[in-house]
Amino acid sequence: MHRYKEEASSLIKLATPVLIASVAQTGMGFVDTVMAGGVSATDMAAVSVASSIWLPSILFGIGLLMALVPVVAQLNGSARREKIPFEIQQGVVLALLISIPIIGVLLQTQFILQLMDVEAVMAGKTVGYIHAVIFAVPAFLLFQTLRSFTDGMSLTKPAMVIGFIGLLLNIPLNWIFVYGKFGAPELGGVGCGVATTIVYWVMFALLLAYVMTSSRLKSINVFGEYHKPQWKAQVRLFKLGFPVAAALFFEVTLFAVVALLVSPLGPIIVAAHQVAINFSSLVFMLPMSVGAAVSIRVGHRLGEENVDGARVASRVGIMVGLALATITAIITVLSRELIAELYTNNPEVISLAMQLLLFAAVYQCTDAVQVIAAGALRGYKDMRAIFNRTFIAYWILGLPTGYILGRTDWIVEPMGAQGFWLGFIIGLTAAALMLGVRLRWMHRQEPDVQLNFSLQ
C-alpha cells in the first residue's frame, strides 16, 4: 500500500504542472476569442473557424514529437543519458521537416473555406489569421521537442512556467495588434494570429535558454556536440510517433466533424452543443495531465528494468484518474444549470445544455480510463495498439452510431444532438475497454517481453 501512496504522490507532482500548462494554453485561446469578439462578431467567428483548421494540423505534429517523451524517460531511467542529445537533435530535425507539410495544409485554408461556403468577409479574416500563424508552426514544434525532453526528464515545471509567461505576453500583444496600439496596424482577428506567432517564438527561446543553462540538465549538455541528421533515426521516430499523432487527430477530428454535423440542426442546438463540449474539454485536462505523467513514470521505470514499478505506475494512474473523474462527474450533474448559465442567458440553450452535460458526466470516467491507459501504453512504446483501437472506437463505432441516432430514423426517431452524445459515450467507452484490455495484456507478459516492447 505504501508503494501505491508514493506512486500517487509522484504522479500528482508530475501531473500538476502539465495541467497548469494546459490551462495556460487554453487561456491563450480564450484571450484570442474575447479580444477578437471586442472588434466584431465576424472577427470572433473567423478566429474560431481558423482554430478548427489550425488545431488538428498542429496537433498531428505534436503527436509525432510526443514519442520523444518515453524515449528520454527510458534513457534517463537506464542511466544512458549520454544518448539523449542524439535523440533530441534528431527530434529538432523532425520538427523542422514536419513543419513543411503542416504549413502546406494551412496554405489550403482558402480552398477549405470555399468548400464550406463560408461568407466572404469572414473567410478573408480567417485566411489572414492562418497566414499570420503559419510562421508559428516551426516555433511551436521546436518548443514541443524541447518540452518532450524536459518532460521525459521528469521536469514538468519549466513548460508550466513558460506557458504562463506566454499567456501573460499574449494579452498585451493581442491588444496591440488587434486594436492597433503603439503605431501597429489595427488588424482585428488577424492580429491574434500575429500575437500567437510572436508568443510561440518567445516560448521556444525561453525553453531553449532553460535547457542550455539549467544546472539539472548540465550533465546532458544536449547541444554540446553536433549530431548529424540520420535517416534511420528520423524514420524510427516517425514510426514511433505516427500512431500517437493519428490517434490525436482521430479524436480531435471526431469532435470537429460532429460539430459540423450538428450545425444544420439550428443555432439553439449548436450553442448548447458548444457549451457542453467546451466544459467537457476543460474537465478532460485533468485525466489528460495524469496520462502524460503516467507515460513519464512508466517509461522511467522500464528504463530501470523495473517492470513491477511500471505496472504500479499504470494502475495508480488509472485509480487517480477514476477518482478525479468521479468527483468531476458528480459536480457536473449537481451544477449543470450553473455551468450552462456561465456561458449563456438563453433559457432554451441552458435547458438543452443541461441535458447534454448529463451525457458529459456519464463518459468522464471512461474518458479518464482511455486517456490514462493510452499514456501508460506510450510509456511501453506500444504505439500501434493506441492507433488501432482509437480508430475503431471513434470512427467505426462512435461517429457512425452518433450519426445514425442523431440524424436518421434507422433505429429510433432522429435524436438530434443527444444522439451524437450517445455516440461519444459509445466511442469513448469502447476506447477505454480496448486500451484497458491491451494494458492488462501487457502487464501479464513476461518481464523480457515488456522490456523488449520498450526497446523499439
Swiss-Prot record:
UniProt lineage: Bacteria, Pseudomonadati, Pseudomonadota, Gammaproteobacteria, Vibrionales
GO annotation, biological process: response to antibiotic; sodium ion transport
MF-aspect GO terms: antiporter activity; xenobiotic transmembrane transporter activity
InterPro entries noted in UniProt: MATE_fam, MATE_MdtK, MdtK-like
Keywords, ordered alphabetically: Antibiotic resistance, Antiport, Cell inner membrane, Cell membrane, Ion transport, Membrane, Sodium, Sodium transport, Transmembrane, Transmembrane helix, Transport
Originating organism: Vibrio parahaemolyticus serotype O3:K6 (strain RIMD 2210633)
Membrane disposition: Multi-pass membrane protein
Primary localization: membrane
Location within or outside the cell: Cell inner membrane
Superkingdom of source: Bacteria
Keyword field contains Transmembrane: yes
Protein name: Multidrug resistance protein NorM
NCBIfam families: matE
Gene Ontology cellular component terms for the protein in this record: plasma membrane
Role this protein plays: Multidrug efflux pump that functions as a Na(+)/drug antiporter. Confers resistance to several drugs, such as norfloxacin, ciprofloxacin, ethidium, kanamycin and streptomycin.
CDD domains, sorted: MATE_NorM_like (cd13131)
Transmembrane segments: 11-31, 53-73, 92-112, 126-146, 159-179, 189-209, 242-262, 268-288, 314-334, 356-376, 385-405, 417-437
Family: Belongs to the multi antimicrobial extrusion (MATE) (TC 2.A.66.1) family.
Keyword field contains Kinase: no
